[in-house]
Regions:
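Short acidic, gly/pro-rich beta-turn/loop elements at beta-sheet edges
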Residues: 18-20, 50, 65-67, 82-84, ...
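A structural detector for beta-sheet-dominated domains
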Residues: 41-43, 58, 75
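Short loop segments at secondary-structure junctions
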Residues: 13-14, 43-45, 77, 110, ...
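Vicinal oxygen chelate
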Residues: 3, 5-12, 32, 39-41, 53, 60-81, 85, ...
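Acidic pyrophosphate-coordinating catalytic loop
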Residues: 43-49, 62-65, 112
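Core segments of cupin and vicinal oxygen chelate
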Residues: 2, 9-53, 82, 88, ...
């Protein structure tokens, strides 16, 4: 394949704050904070295959006003523990019309960007992830 995703960019009002928040949520590290742009990367050694992109937070002047057209889906080992953890970090549950019968929960980060915490990994999936 000749292309790969280098990074995922998220528009925001305060790149430094949102990068730190997402780094805490994902267990990643902030590797750049240059005022209008901040970058988080996964821990060293977690992307030897080059598949995991950086996340870049870019300052924009306009506030978020509608539902995201792109969002992150996070797959935990223990969904209930992660729901409690992201809420303790400041994530807010949001209703985007998903209903109560879903295996995922929709949240918003401190600037209102939606993301989902999916069902927990099965033991087989955990073993595959090593």
């Amino acid at each position: 394949m000749s292309l790969r995703i280098q990074c995922v960019c998220i528009d925001c009002a305060d790149p430094a704050v949102l990068a730190r928040w997402w780094a805490d949520v994902l267990g990643w590290r902030v590797t750049a904070d240059e005022g209008d742009e901040a970058v988080i990367e996964p821990p060293a050694g977690s992307r030897e295959d080059g598949v995991v992109p950086d996340v870049v937070f870019l300052r924009v002047p306009e506030p978020k006003t509608v539902k995201n057209r792109l969002h992150l889906d996070l797959r935990p080992v223990d969904q209930q523990a992660e729901l409690a953890r992201v809420e303790a970090l400041g994530a807010k549950r949001v209703d985007i019309g998903q209903g109560d019968d879903k295996t995922w929960v929709v949240y918003a980060d401190p600037e209102g960007n939606e993301f989902c915490v999916l069902r927990a990994l099965t033991p087989e999936e955990v073993a595959e992830d090593g």
